[in-house]
Amino acid sequence: MKRLLIIFVVAVSACKPPTPAEQMDSIQSWLATAELVGEAWLRHTTPDKYSRQTLELSRETLLQISSDLLKSPPHSVDSASLDSILTRSRVSVAQMARLIQAKDAPDFGRQLDSLRADQKLVKQLSDSIESRQ
């Protein structure tokens, strides 16, 4: 009986949708992944294919999390600003993947800088959401 109760509690917990703060944490994590892969690619320590695929996965995952978050945006932030920052971040990540294909390190570095600036804004929004939960 105890075992069934534990399984039920775990199953119910697993079905609970993530909170906006948890979604923002995931977004920050995927942006950090893109940043780290970008830095590694610029240092020539990761293969082009791996770097490009990781950036593409980051963009796709960011799109999914962002879409879910914006279906029911947190009340503590302006949803238009949040959407704008998240869209800009995804575009930067997608552009970085294309620039790897083109082997264009100078433009890649500029996109990486843009991504870093957006990461700071996402962190501020995330902190705002977390403090109001």
Spans of model-derived segments:
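Bacterial signal peptide processing site
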Residues: 14-18
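Juxtamembrane amphipathic/coiled-coil helical coupling segments that flank
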Residues: 130-133
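Sec-dependent N-terminal signal peptides
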Residues: 4-13
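Alpha-helical transmembrane segments
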Residues: 1-5, 24-27
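Alpha-helical segments in soluble extracytoplasmic regions
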Residues: 22-95, 110-114
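Extracytosolic low-complexity repeat regions of secreted or lipid-anchored proteins
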Residues: 86-128
